[in-house]
């Protein structure tokens, strides 16, 4: 494993972790969600599956999260997450492990980011696996209680306890919500002609199953899969859920990495 810091387009540091395969069968970039970090269990388990299949795995902390990169979580936006993904891939293109087409995986805000990348650069990507992805700002808005949204707007920020980092309170500016409204995966879903694997928890209230079914329906062809993990929430942590996700990935990678 090799961990380094690179600069993004704003001259901020991004922490990148590269796990090289000795006999590389493929390359995958794995991306966390809002307020996440590259070592979260649901990312570790996906990385394990790809490594077992001979892939070089690249993970990174976006800026404005709780990892090792620059910035503050309260300033996080989908725009900044997506730009960091582009910048990590651009940097990787100068490295000896780089190959195209590569694979992409992302969770939640990372999920919409990797699909946006595919929609913008379909020829560079062999397959994409959004886990519990945000589908659009519009659908996200429908998911909010109008009273909570009004309170967030009036106050300028909202706070909640972190699920992954005990004792950490996450404060997020209202600008994140406004920025998210600019994005929607559905109009360009026709570009998703490569294998697409969508995974979502049955009890996900942030990016619920009904949102994933809308995205799934918009994707053309027959190289698409939607897996619903029973009893699972938005962020996966239970061992049985993690193992199920790993098994799904192992089968999917085997099916399409030829």
Feature roles, as predicted:
Residues 1-23:
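N-terminal cap/lid segment of alpha/beta-hydrolase-fold proteins
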Residues 41-70:
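Conserved alpha/beta-hydrolase
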Residues 43, 194, 208-217:
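Short alpha-helix in the alpha/beta-hydrolase fold that links the catalytic acid
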Residues 75-96:
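Alpha/beta-hydrolase active-site loop
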Residues 192-193, 198-200, 204:
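Short beta-strand/loop motif that positions the catalytic acidic residue
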Residues 203-207, 235:
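Acidic catalytic loop of the alpha/beta-hydrolase fold
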Residues 232-245:
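Catalytic histidine-centered segment of alpha/beta-hydrolase-like enzymes
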């Amino acid at each position: 494993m090799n961990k380094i810091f690179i600069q993004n387009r704003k001259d901020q540091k991004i922490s990148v972790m590269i796990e090289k395969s000795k006999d590389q069968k493929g390359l995958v970039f794995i991306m966390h969600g809002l307020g996440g970090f590259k070592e979260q269990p649901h990312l570790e388990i996906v990385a394990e599956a790809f490594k077992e299949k001979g892939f070089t795995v690249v993970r990174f902390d976006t800026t404005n999260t709780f990892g090792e990169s620059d910035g503050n979580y309260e300033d996080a936006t989908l725009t900044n997450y997506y730009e960091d993904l582009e910048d990590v891939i651009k940097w990787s293109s100068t490295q000896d492990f780089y190959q195209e087409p590569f694979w992409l995986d992302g969770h939640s805000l990372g999920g919409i980011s990797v699909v946006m990348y595919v929609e913008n650069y379909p020829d560079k990507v062999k397959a994409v696996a959004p886990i519990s992805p945000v589908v659009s700002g519009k659908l996200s808005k429908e998911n909010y209680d109008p009273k909570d949204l009004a309170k967030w707007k009036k106050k300028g920020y909202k706070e909640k306890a972190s699920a992954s980092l005990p004792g950490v309170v996450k404060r997020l500016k209202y600008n994140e919500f406004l920025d998210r409204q600019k994005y929607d995966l559905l109009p360009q879903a026709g570009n998703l002609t490569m294998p697409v694997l969508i995974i979502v928890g049955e009890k996900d209230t942030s990016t619920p199953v009904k949102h994933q079914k809308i995205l799934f329906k918009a994707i053309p062809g027959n190289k698409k899969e939607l897996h619903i993990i029973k009893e699972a929430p938005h962020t996966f942590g239970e061992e049985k859920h993690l193992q199920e996700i790993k098994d799904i990935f192992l089968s999917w990678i085997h099916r399409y990495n030829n």
